[in-house]
Amino acid sequence: MSQVYNFSAGPAMLPAEVLRRAELELCNWHGLGRSVMEISHRSKEFLEVAHQAEQDLRDLLNVPENYKILFCHGGARGHFAALPLNLLGEKTTADYIDGGYWAKSAADEAEKYCSPNIIKIKTEIDGKIAVKPMKEWQLSDNAAYVHYCPNETIDGIAIHEEPDFDDKKIVIADYSSAILSQPLDVSRFGMIYAGAQKNIGPAGLTLVIIREDLLGKARKETPSVFDYTVLAENDSMFNTPPTFAWYLSGMVFKWLKEQGGLQEIAKRNYEKATLLYSAIDNSDFYINRIATENRSLMNVPFQMSSPALDAVFLKEAEEQGLVALKGHRVSGGMRASIYNAMPFAGVQALVDFMADFERRHA
């Protein structure tokens, strides 16, 4: 079978080495005569998987000891609700930074539980979409926390700054599409959460990294499966966790360490994104509407000067093994998601195809 490069925004491409290893182990994991999908989450064997996955993740992100790592159900959308239920405490408002589709979705969900202070940060620079720098965010004094999304998967907008607010501010970030793409100072955040299906592993698992002093504040009506204190006290096994997704995510963590860690991964991601954005910027046929300083390194949306060619582009791209390039229904056009698992060769193949398509259709 010819090479296929999967540019899906999620569920996304997984490292080929991880998939090959999983294939070898699928039916007879560690000589047990069973798949890892069939063993108890409380067995000695799976507890070793869980412990190693957590340790490898701690190593990759240099997670401080006063942070708990939770492997949860629910997807990021589930945690849009779990977050206010766990962290509002006695307060009735939280700051929600609206920088794109997913940040706004989190704020919309929070309205069920509080009165969010929605801070719009989108602006324009020379006709391009940008976001205001953090120093211009008008944060409130009485908010329980500040929530933002550093990488907007649909919009292709990134906030590359790390928070540097007053020490009293509890900063929460939805890192679903940027987690593990570069080094990160976890200590600047009260909590980070991320759906696994983009840069961690298969769909069905959600990662939560939360500072210990934020536990124990959940409202009494919080479902137990979404109570971070309950999950922490039970080592993420209050109910049966998504064991196969946990196992595969652990393999991805190990793969990232084998590649040289997040410094090396960040270098590769920058090189891939630079190649693709350069191809777009040097063309009159392709258009990216995001200001350079706020472009995502993970999700690159682009349109063609003639939208009537979209279907032709997608069909021909798929014939060349370049799949899942259709843009989100909200934004249209094309979108290339180039997460950690996407090799440079995949982006090069896309750029070569784009140049050839332009020659034939411009």
Swiss-Prot record:
Homodimer. GO terms for biological process: L-serine biosynthetic process; pyridoxine biosynthetic process. Binds 1 pyridoxal phosphate per subunit. Pathway: Amino-acid biosynthesis; L-serine biosynthesis; L-serine from 3-phospho-D-glycerate: step 2/3; Cofactor biosynthesis; pyridoxine 5'-phosphate biosynthesis; pyridoxine 5'-phosphate from D-erythrose 4-phosphate: step 3/5. NCBIfam families: PRK05355.1, serC_1. Keywords: Amino-acid biosynthesis, Aminotransferase, Cytoplasm, Pyridoxal phosphate, Pyridoxine biosynthesis, Serine biosynthesis, Transferase. Belongs to the class-V pyridoxal-phosphate-dependent aminotransferase family. SerC subfamily. GO terms for cellular component: cytoplasm. Its EC number is 2.6.1.52. The gene is serC. It catalyses: O-phospho-L-serine + 2-oxoglutarate = 3-phosphooxypyruvate + L-glutamate; 4-(phosphooxy)-L-threonine + 2-oxoglutarate = (R)-3-hydroxy-2-oxo-4-phosphooxybutanoate + L-glutamate. This is Phosphoserine aminotransferase. L-glutamate binds at residue 42. One of its GO terms (molecular function) is O-phospho-L-serine:2-oxoglutarate aminotransferase activity. The modification N6-(pyridoxal phosphate)lysine is found at residue 198. It is found in: Cytoplasm. PROSITE patterns: AA_TRANSFER_CLASS_5. Its cofactor is pyridoxal 5'-phosphate. Catalyzes the reversible conversion of 3-phosphohydroxypyruvate to phosphoserine and of 3-hydroxy-2-oxo-4-phosphonooxybutanoate to phosphohydroxythreonine. Pyridoxal 5'-phosphate binds at residues 76-77, 102, 153, 174, 197, 239-240. Pfam families: Aminotran_5.
